[in-house]
């Protein structure tokens, strides 16, 4: 009798398709994590959109402060506040870039997992594992 977690072998010595314990566990884990990954991805997308909006608002406010500063007859020094706004904008852009990179890595990982899952399903459906397959 074949050990648990290994593929069965036909009388001709060729491996017969059958989900191994490892494959079943991997598939279950993927299905379990998929909603969380999708939710995380949608939240990251929403945060990125709000950061773009925040960056635009900071730009508008900085422009308006510069305009007010130029139009004032009284010497009102708004430059430190404009600099603080621009520094905040720079930080928002930095965080947005970090989020964008993380989201792209997550997207590539998700694509890679989906591709591997499809490959394994195709192997299971075909009924034969290639020689030297780690799923044997």
UniProtKB/Swiss-Prot annotation:
Primary localization class, coarse: membrane
Any one Pfam family match given in the protein's UniProt record, by short name: Snapin_Pallidin
Post-translational modification: Phosphorylated by PKD, phosphorylation controls SNAPIN protein stability. Phosphorylated by CSNK1D/CK1.
Record's keyword terms, sorted: Acetylation, Coiled coil, Cytoplasm, Cytoplasmic vesicle, Exocytosis, Golgi apparatus, Lysosome, Membrane, Phosphoprotein, Synapse
Coiled coil: 37-126
Keyword NADP attached: no
Tissues expressing the protein: Strongly expressed in heart, brain, testis, kidney and liver; low expression in spleen, lung and skeletal muscle. In the testis, expressed in the seminiferous tubules.
Residues where Phosphothreonine is found: 14
GO CC, alphabetical: acrosomal vesicle; axon cytoplasm; BLOC-1 complex; BORC complex; cytoplasmic side of lysosomal membrane; cytoplasmic vesicle; cytosol; Golgi membrane
Signal peptide positions (record): none
Modified residues (Phosphotyrosine): 129
Domain of life per record: Eukaryota
Topological type in the membrane: Peripheral membrane protein
One annotated GO molecular function: SNARE binding
UniProt-annotated stretches for the region Interaction with TOR1A: 83-136
Family: Belongs to the SNAPIN family.
PANTHER family to which the protein is assigned, alphabetical: SNARE-ASSOCIATED PROTEIN SNAPIN
Identification of the protein by name: SNARE-associated protein Snapin
Native organism: Mus musculus (Mouse)
């Amino acid at each position: 009798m074949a050990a648990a977690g290994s593929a069965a072998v036909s009388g001709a010595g060729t491996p017969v398709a059958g989900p191994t314990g490892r494959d079943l566990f991997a598939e279950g884990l993927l299905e379990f994590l998929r909603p969380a990954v999708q939710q995380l991805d949608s939240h990251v997308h929403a945060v990125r959109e709000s950061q773009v909006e925040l960056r635009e608002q900071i730009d508008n406010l900085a422009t308006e402060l510069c305009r007010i500063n130029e139009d004032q007859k009284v010497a009102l020094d708004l430059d430190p506040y404009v600099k603080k706004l621009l520094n905040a904008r720079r930080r928002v852009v930095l965080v947005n870039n970090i989020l964008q990179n993380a989201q792209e890595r997550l997207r590539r990982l998700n694509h890679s997992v989906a591709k591997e899952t499809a490959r394994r399903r195709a192997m299971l459906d075909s009924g034969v594992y290639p020689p030297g397959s780690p799923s044997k």
